[in-house]
Amino acid sequence: MSAEPHPLYRQLPAIDRLLNEPEMAPLLAEYGPVLLADTLRQLQAEAREYIGQFHTLADWCADWPAALRQRLNQRQPALKPVFNLTGTVLHTNLGRAPLAESAIAAVTDAMRSAVTLEYSLEGAGRGHRDRAVADLLCALTGAEDACIVNNNAAAVFLLLTVMAAGKQVVVSRGELVEIGGAFRIPDVMRQAGCELVEVGTTNRTHLKDYRQAINENTGLLMKVHTSNYSIEGFTAAVSEQQLAALGQECSIPTATDLGSGSLVDMTRYGLPAEPMPQQLIAAGVDLVTFSGDKLLGGPQAGIILGKKQWIERLQQHPLKRALRADKMTLAALDATLRLYQQPDRLVEQLPSLRLLTRPASEIAACAQRLLAPLIACYGTDFTLDIESCWSQIGSGSLPVDRLPSWALTFTPKDGRGSTLEALTARWRTLTKPVIGRVADGRLWLDLRCLEDEAALLRELAS
């Protein structure tokens, strides 16, 4: 015989009855009947489970409107702002570069109103969505034209598809990179319908290696900047200028995937050197690709610069429509690029550059200010210290180089890793989660990216 249903189940009110109660009217006006009904079903399922386990009603069953409001208040957006205290400035998993205020304002304006996305005010007709941003890029880099897609992987894929589908692409063996998410250059070439021709060795490639690989089916000579690793020691590589000259001699286009790509000389700000797109354009490279949300400090985007004849081919290919950027991306990119027209104010206005160039002394002072109030909150269970550490740029940018920084460390007094795990798990449930890193039996909060100390203290004291 089947078990009799628990009599307490009959005390659970029908959803229709609950929705018609006067106390529900404000919630109905705020959230609508569909969301309320779905949430009430979840609550009733939990109530039945509670009855089955404890043979009594849960306390919150005495006030369904209050329980419903509490549950609705707990709903969180899929993308939550967090405190990035990992020590990785351009953290791919945490959204890479924070946008400048002017870029945020531009995106907001683009969302609120109709915009001239593909409309020419001068000609009162159809325009091209890349045009305004392309003109800015050309002015900043000296390129003849530019093309914008939704990320750099798309830029590389479009370039290979248009320039070399059914043909051979010659690349140094030492530049066959893999980036996060198993994005491998050989795999991308295969998907684009290209045949990869590896030349040279892992550590040494010469111009003659490229020359010997050229035949009637060669479609592209390519270089890939090894932005997420470094080969040192007994090495040799072909410069973009040398490869471009060979391409011109043999009437074969050349391309370079920069990956990160910076429009300013990073050494000017005390950071390690990184090749700039304008340098490669000046060297004669036909097409250059790089990301918008790494060292550039803008939105996720793939940027292709180069000769007008090749950019026009990219723009005309059907794949471009599938990969094109939307109005919000273009608005943010446009606003970000305009900041580069005032290089003397770039550190002040571009958040990513401001964080990358933040002096270690300023970070140490921040740690000193935070130490005492955090000891008051956590000193019972943890030993808190200020430690020097090294931040990294992230997103495959300048992989070998580190930035001197300072961190607050939390060491559990009971010596248990589970205590650290419990702390980090609790911090991930905060209104604005705090994300650090665990290493050497301690939790490290690298303070390089912390700009609102008061907000952090409010969260950690809650």
Swiss-Prot record:
It catalyses: L-seryl-tRNA(Sec) + selenophosphate + H(+) = L-selenocysteinyl-tRNA(Sec) + phosphate. SUPFAM superfamilies: PLP-dependent transferases. GO terms for biological process: conversion of seryl-tRNAsec to selenocys-tRNAsec; selenocysteine incorporation. Coiled coil: none annotated. The keyword Cytoplasm applies. Keywords: Cytoplasm, Protein biosynthesis, Pyridoxal phosphate, Selenium, Transferase. Its cofactor is pyridoxal 5'-phosphate. Belongs to the SelA family. Converts seryl-tRNA(Sec) to selenocysteinyl-tRNA(Sec) required for selenoprotein biosynthesis. Homodecamer; pentamer of dimers. Binds only one seryl-tRNA(Sec) per dimer. This is L-seryl-tRNA(Sec) selenium transferase.
